Design a protein with these regions (language model features):
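Short catalytic/ligand-binding loop motif for oxyanion handling, primarily in non-cytosolic enzymes
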Residues: 142-144, 177-183, 257-263, 302-306, ...
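Bacterial Sec-dependent N-terminal signal peptides
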Residues: 3-80
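Catalytic-core regions of glycoside hydrolase
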Residues: 78-118, 163, 250-390
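N-terminal substrate-binding region of glycoside hydrolase catalytic domains
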Residues: 77-226, 345-371, 379-396
Length: 543
């Protein structure tokens, strides 16, 4: 029952589009190819046609084969045949890049076979089959141990391990973590992760009371001019190192407060800086990060939230489910056409024991509330479970079917709903046109450019010729719950070899993150939610 509910809850968005012609290399045989696409929604319809006189004959590896069946149509010009393809949804969980679930990945040791909850551990933790990016935290004082000195070595080791497992990373650098304040005698460096040199050159700190255990603790003065100067200097260095790095999914702006969450609710005596200072920090981050997605932490609200959106900085919330209405707070970012990010109020095991007492407590985790949080907030990025101990092991064992289904709801999810190949043989040429309809059945747009390619392939899956042109779909334009129609045309002059007529030839569809990846012969990285996916991530159409 929950599976059907999860798959049915999607939201509507406005549609807009643009498309650019893509030049392909010429083949040895003269053919003409063109592509067009149409956006279908209740508000707009746009058609953009592309044309050229070229075809790509790049090769791929695949072990699948398919021969189409055809039917002739009377009354149409020339000798017309049609192949209508049978389409079904992909059976099982479906992960895709730049969206999805995460679990804590503290360091490269997460991938060591000796860690039983890791992807190679003895427990065979199935949660990792749903994980598309790692998350955790870095300490400012470790990355920046001295003035002008930066040590990225441990972070680089983690990024390399994640890349080897086809995962990105959500980067969060904390200046402070009260979680490690045990008592009033706890060494400051255990929880205050502001580099020592910042204080040595004049930044101020105060003593505050940690409400969790009444311990006295040192806390930075968040609006101190020296602190602000070096917080910005670190941001500049971080951008110089990682802005635009494809291994990074997004970067939180974590300059203030407990865990860098822009609040000091557990530190009696500490105060957040003014709204203007908060805005100024966001402005600085936006000025040095030109490519990577930036995220405003959970407690950035009101004017700060509005200002962040104006800078292209999206929003996260770290207390979904537990506090009523938190998912609604992310709708503003979704409506600004930005990906939304979230965690829950606590780990799965903890949230099962919440009392449902509001006020005075938190709402407990239930499957219905989990689905509602994802769909209400139109989430693109979400923690599967934030328990650092078991990396989602218990959660996944308890909720496998539902969790698998939500991989196709979270973020974008492209499904080919109809596909037909129409071939018209005339006196001068033969034209084959592939018409398809694709729907985004997820709860959010796709927030990166995607490149759609149609190809004729032989019985081994080897690409013989590109059908039409590569179609670029700009980021943010393929809205959730919207459909788009695409046409790919391949024309061959009479008397010239026509690969479409060769025995065993079929059609494949592919989605790439870049045009260069296709031209370079790489496999696509984005997968359709359809039966017929090959080992190289291409979709083989079946009649």
């Amino acid at each position: 029952m929950l599976l059907s509910v999860a798959m049915g809850l999607v939201a509507c968005g406005d549609d807009s589009s643009s498309s650019a012609a893509v030049e392909e290399s010429s083949s040895s045989e003269p053919v003409q190819s063109s592509s067009s696409w149409t956006l279908s929604s209740s508000e707009s319809r746009v058609t953009d046609s592309l044309s050229s006189s070229s075809v790509d004959t790049s090769r791929v590896n695949s072990s699948s084969s398919l021969t189409g069946t055809s039917s002739s149509q009377a009354g149409e010009p020339g000798d017309t045949t049609r192949i209508t393809y049978a389409l079904k949804r992909f059976d099982g969980p479906l992960t895709n890049p730049h969206k999805g679930f995460t679990v804590p990945t503290e360091a490269a040791w997460t991938f060591d076979p000796g860690f039983e909850y890791g992807p190679h551990g003895s427990l065979n933790n199935g949660a990792w089959n749903l994980v598309t990016y790692g998350s955790g935290y870095q300490q400012w004082n470790k990355l920046n141990p001295a003035k002008g000195v930066y040590d990225w070595s441990e972070l680089e080791e983690l990024l390399d391990a994640l890349t080897a497992h086809n995962m990105g990373y959500a980067l969060r650098v904390f200046p402070y973590s009260p979680s490690f304040i045990r008592d009033s005698n706890t060494p400051e460096e255990n929880y205050d992760w502001t580099p020592k040199y910042v204080y040595e050159v004049g930044a101020k700190k105060i003593t505050a009371r940690y409400k969790d255990n009444n311990a006295n603790a040192a806390v930075p003065v968040w609006d101190d001019s020296v602190y602000l100067y070096y917080a910005k200097e670190f941001a500049t260095a971080l951008a110089a190192k990682y802005d635009g790095d494809p291994r990074i999914e997004y970067i939180d702006v974590r300059s203030f407060g407990e865990w860098g969450e822009w609040h000091v609710s557990n530190l009696d005596g500490s105060k957040m800086p003014s709204v203007e200072i908060q805005k100024d920090m966001l402005k600085h981050y936006a000025s040095v990060f030109k490519k990577s997605l930036l995220v405003l932490p959970s407690d950035g609200y009101g004017d700060v939230y509005t200002y962040a959106l104006s800078l292209g900085i999206t929003k996260r919330d770290d207390c979904l489910i537990g506090i009523p209405g938190t998912a609604d707070s992310l709708v503003r970012a979704y409506e600004a056409n930005m990906p939304t990010v979230a965690e829950n109020c606590g780990g799965y095991a903890i949230m099962l024991n919440y009392t449902d007492m509001i006020p005075g407590g938190y709402l407990k985790w239930t499957p219905e509330r989990w689905v509602d949080a994802i769909t209400t907030a139109h989430l693109t990025y979400y923690v599967l479970d934030q328990d650092f101990d078991d990396c989602g092991y218990r959660f996944y064992n308890d909720n496998k079917e539902l969790a698998d289904s939500m991989t196709k709801v979270l973020g974008y999810n492209f499904t080919v709903e109809s596909a037909e190949l129409v071939t018209v043989a005339g006196a001068k040429d033969t034209t084959s046109t592939l018409n398809i309809t694709v729907k985004n059945t997820g709860v959010a747009p796709c927030f990166f450019d995607i490149y759609m390619v149609a190809e004729f392939v032989d019985s081994t899956g080897r690409a013989l010729a590109q059908v039409g042109e590569t179609v670029r779909i700009p980021k943010g334009t393929f809205k959730d719950d919207s459909s788009q129609n695409f046409s790919f045309t391949y024309k061959v002059a009479s008397g010239k070899p026509d690969v479409a007529k060769q025995s065993g030839v079929s059609v494949s569809l592919s989605l790439y993150e870049s045009e260069d990846a296709f031209k370079g012969g790489k496999n696509p990285t984005v997968r359709f939610d359809n039966d017929g996916l090959q080992g190289n991530n291409k979709l083989l159409l079946k009649p």
